[in-house]
Swiss-Prot record:
Name of the protein described by the UniProt record: Large ribosomal subunit protein bL20
Family, per entry: Belongs to the bacterial ribosomal protein bL20 family.
Gene3D superfamilies to which the protein is assigned, alphabetical: 6.10.160.10, Ribosomal protein L20
Source organism of this protein record: Acetivibrio thermocellus (strain ATCC 27405 / DSM 1237 / JCM 9322 / NBRC 103400 / NCIMB 10682 / NRRL B-4536 / VPI 7372) (Clostridium thermocellum)
GO molecular function, one term: structural constituent of ribosome
Species classification: Bacteria, Bacillati, Bacillota, Clostridia, Eubacteriales
Length: 117
């Protein structure tokens, strides 16, 4: 029986990696070995940053809420504690959106929280 070297499968694998590396600079988009390393590293970065994105947005929301709350005379922690005590269930994403795009409504929310504290 003759030996099969697997050229078809190898060609397909190389094409798949080079397709993923399309747009990379220099040898990273032309040379399979270098492109393979670049693609593997980019997938590691993508995996890591999908998780980091969640942390980054939470930090951004907290910063925005804190800034808006301080403009209305409360710290972030007192504001969040007052929200919890008053039974207002708004998540940080919605609060940050309100703080940026609807400052009047956010100010009314702060007044409700001040009444509870």
């Amino acid at each position: 029986m003759s030996r099969v070297k697997g050229g078809v499968r190898t060609r397909a694998r190389h094409k798949k990696i080079l397709k993923l590396a399309k747009g990379y600079f220099g040898a990273k988009s032309k040379n399979f070995r270098i492109a393979n390393q670049a693609v593997m590293k980019s997938l590691v970065y993508a995996y890591r940053d999908r998780r980091a994105r969640k942390r980054d947005f939470r930090k951004l929301w907290i910063t925005r809420i804190n800034a808006a709350a301080r403009m209305n005379g409360l710290s972030y922690s007192k504001f969040m504690n007052g929200l919890k005590k008053s039974g207002i269930a708004l998540n940080r994403k919605m609060l940050a959106e309100m703080a940026v795009n609807d400052a009047e409504a956010f100010a009314q929310l702060v007044e409700k929280v001040k009444a509870v504290i």
